[in-house]
Each structure stands twice: as C-alpha cells, then as structure tokens.
C-alpha cells in the first residue's frame, strides 16, 4: 500500500486488533499511520482538558483523573495524558480499577499500567472519590450524581460514550459539574476526532513526516487548545468545522 498512498488513517477497529494492525503497518510501511479512534480522540480530549482546567482554575499536573474504559480510545488517552504530565491517573474497566493486585489483565492492559497509578484497587465508586476529572469512553449510565458528589469542587466530566454518554449533561450539571464535554454535536464541547486528524495528516504530508510521534500528538493538542482564546464552561474545544484547525495543527507537525 505504501507506494500508492501518502498516509493511512485507520477507523472503527476495536481493541486489541487495532493495536496489532497499527503496529504492523507502522513497522512495514514508510508512510504515516494513524488510528484516529485512538489518537485523534486522545488529542482532542487533552486539548479540551487543557482549557477546562483553565476554566476551573486548576493545574492538570495537580489533578486526579479517573478514566473509565480501557479499550482503544481509553488506552491512547491515558498514554497522552501521562506524557503531558497529568497528576494522578486511575483507569477503570468492567472489573474495577486497573491495579497491581489484578491477575486478570490481558497484555494490553498490563502494558497500560506503565502510564497509570496502580496502587489503589476497588471500584469506580472508590476511584472517583476526590477526583477532579472524569473521562468516560465506555457505555451509558456509568456515572451517577452520587459519584459526582464525591468528586472535588468544580469537577470536570468528559462523558464520551456515543450515542449516549456515561451521564447526560443536564443531569451532570445539576450534580455540580463545572465543565462538561461529550462526543455529540448537539451539546457544547464535542470531543470529535475529526477536529484533529485532518490537520495532523496535512502537516505530515506537507512536511514529509513518515511517523506520527507522541510529540506530534502533544503539539497538536496544545495547538487545538490555543484556538480557544478565552475558554468558558461551554467552549473549551473549537468547533469541528473551524477553518483555523487544519492550518494551525499542520504547522506544528514538523
């Protein structure tokens, strides 16, 4: 494929196959390979969190983050947040917190532990106590108002399950959430991987980049965040059709 195409964008491939396919393509091809369900989602999530933290007056480096869903998107989000310098990061799957005492983890989740804080075991309810940020890439209804009440003041919730998020925005705001994002276009702050990948590919193609690195993803997230000059609770992420996105992101993929 490499002689015929300038780059490969992978779409709608579930874990763990997506990890294997992406890694093999990166190894065998000398063109950029990017699974946007993983990395595009992670880039836009980080961009939104950078601005959400500004809205509530917190530093991401001091925040406790709880991530539910350790599949393709969750894995990429965890890795990028850690590389950015997030404070404390716990991941939760269907069996509880991913921790040192778990003996049921597959190879991908075991590798993911390198990016997590794994000294605490228990349930989502245990993990979310004292958290500043909740990120959901799992399924509807997992986050309750009672859980939000256990979070720190001015909690940030990115409930990204589609089409129905882990908690609906109106219910989350009634429970005290300060900044809310979803994966849907009919609510403010849509986390859509289409915000990121066109500009990343434009930059890679224009600049002859053969591998899209973690540094490129971090640069893209920071560039996206910078397009929101004065973040508010209802605007921490640019709109997906913002004409500034592609040239701004492309300029940092060098």
Please name every model-derived segment:
Residues 1-2, 26-27, 56-60, 82-83, ...:
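Solvent-exposed alpha-helices and their adjacent loops that cap or buttress functional pockets
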Residues 1-64:
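Glycine/serine-rich phosphate-binding loop and adjoining beta1-alpha1 elements at the start
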Residues 9-12, 33-36, 91, 135-136, ...:
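General beta-strand structural signal in soluble alpha/beta enzymes
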Residues 17-29, 36-39, 97-116, 217, ...:
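A cross-family phosphate/adenosyl-ligand binding-site feature
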Residues 36-37, 56-59, 159-161, 165-254:
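Adenosine-phosphate binding glycine-rich loop
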Residues 43-136:
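Glycine-rich phosphate/diphosphate-binding loop of Rossmann-like nucleotide-binding domains
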Residues 110-179, 184-186:
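Rossmann-like adenosine-cofactor binding region
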């Amino acid at each position: 494929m490499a002689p015929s195409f300038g780059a490969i964008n992978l779409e709608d491939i579930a874990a763990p196959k997506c990890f294997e396919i992406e890694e093999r393509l990166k190894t065998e091809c000398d063109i950029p390979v990017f699974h946007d369900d993983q990395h595009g989602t992670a880039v836009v999530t980080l961009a939104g969190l950078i601005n959400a933290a500004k809205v509530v007056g917190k530093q991401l480096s001091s925040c406790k983050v709880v991530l539910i869903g350790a599949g393709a998107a969750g894995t990429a989000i965890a890795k990028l947040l850690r590389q950015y310098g997030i404070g404390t990061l716990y991941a939760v799957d269907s069996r509880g917190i991913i921790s040192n005492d778990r003996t049921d983890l597959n190879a991908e989740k075991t590798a993911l532990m390198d990016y997590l804080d794994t000294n605490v075991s228990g349930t989502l309810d245990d993990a979310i106590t004292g958290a500043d940020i909740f990120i959901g890439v799992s399924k509807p209804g997992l986050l309750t108002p009672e859980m939000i009440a256990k979070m720190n003041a001015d909690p940030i919730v990115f409930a990204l399950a589609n089409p129905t998020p882990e908690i609906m925005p109106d219910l989350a705001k009634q429970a005290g959430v300060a900044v809310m994002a979803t994966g849907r276009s009919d609510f403010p702050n849509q986390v859509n991987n289409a915000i990121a990948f066109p500009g990343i590919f434009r930059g890679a193609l224009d600049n002859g980049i053969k591998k899209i690195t973690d540094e490129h993803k971090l640069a893209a997230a920071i560039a996206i965040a910078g397009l929101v000059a004065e973040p508010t609770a209802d605007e921490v992420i640019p709109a997906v059709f913002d004409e500034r996105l592609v040239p701004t992101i492309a300029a940092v993929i060098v």
